[in-house]
Amino acid sequence: IPHNIDGKYQPDAYKYCAGYQYDDKTIVGFSHTHFNGTGHSDLGDILIMPMIGDVKLDMGKADSTELGYRSHFNHKTEKAEPGYYSVILDDYNILAELTATDRVGVHRYTFPKDTKDGHIILDLTYGIYNYDGKVLIANLRVEDEYTLTGYRITRGWSRMNYTYFAVRFSKPIKNYGCRNTEKVKYNGFWRKFDMTDNFPEMFGNKLIAFFDFDFSDNKPLEIKVGLSAVDCLGALKNLEAETKGKSFNEIKEETQNKWEKELSCIKIDADYDKKCVFYTSLYHTMINPSIYQDIDGRYRGIDHNIHQATKGQTNYTVFSVWDTFRGEHPLMNLIKPSRSEQFVNSMLNHYLQSVHKVLPIWSHMGNENWCMIGY
């Protein structure tokens, strides 16, 4: 989706930058926040990975995928279009498909026929440019047999990144559990519960959960993941507002129509190869900055307080100004002037909320990173 909250919805195969490198041979999973075209790294929040067989709560290694949940893949089975991605996870023979709305990542997983032991891994420890201690805390609640909510707070390049989420499955959960290997001592009375086996609230800074589903009907599993930087209620509202009652195919069609409209703002007369180069480049100009605001107008500011956008205003984040001031923003002034105005207003709000009273230098997810110069 152009300028959506994810930045770029894709598989995670590489541990730096945007999380994907063409030379990689394995996919770790599918997370919900990414950069596009950066040299530095962060994000990769809320990783989902389907698998069959015995549940594995370790990532595994690229040269020994049997030790974890990651899978080999082949570029011959990949398909990437604006608004859609698919690939076969070779270790499991699972077809993975992705699409999105402005604030919701949408998955569809087709498991092999007659699968009996299908699982979804939800890894809240994973991150791009990951290291021990990056996840400060994570929480996961099973609201009902179809719905999860939760959050995680990380300290990476973004000094304090709040990611709230709501997950909706198309099939009921049969069984679930988790593993939390944190070493922080906890002396409260929650320790009397066994969080690892069907306990509906899981908490920790090294939390990986699994969910079992019945695939005897041979139907694919669809998963919708709403995101918010404000709270879980905001993530649920975003999920409902943008995807309620819609199938994967319907959302994919809407998303691709939106991309078609966006990319049609410039028309060129050229051969096929030149058109591919041109429109791929134009596509990349429409990924960042990213929407950073709930459907009800609330957003987390640079001061980490919750603000309410004025009517007609959309708050954006991911301003790599030293990259974009000379190319991206002049182009947006020409082809998308109303959106460019929203970018400027977001920058001005950044200034007003900044204790240093500065415009964005390199900001993302409600944080100023002080990387490079932009003015």
Regions found by a protein language model. Name each.
Residues 1-329, 333-375:
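Accessory carbohydrate-recognition regions in carbohydrate-active enzymes
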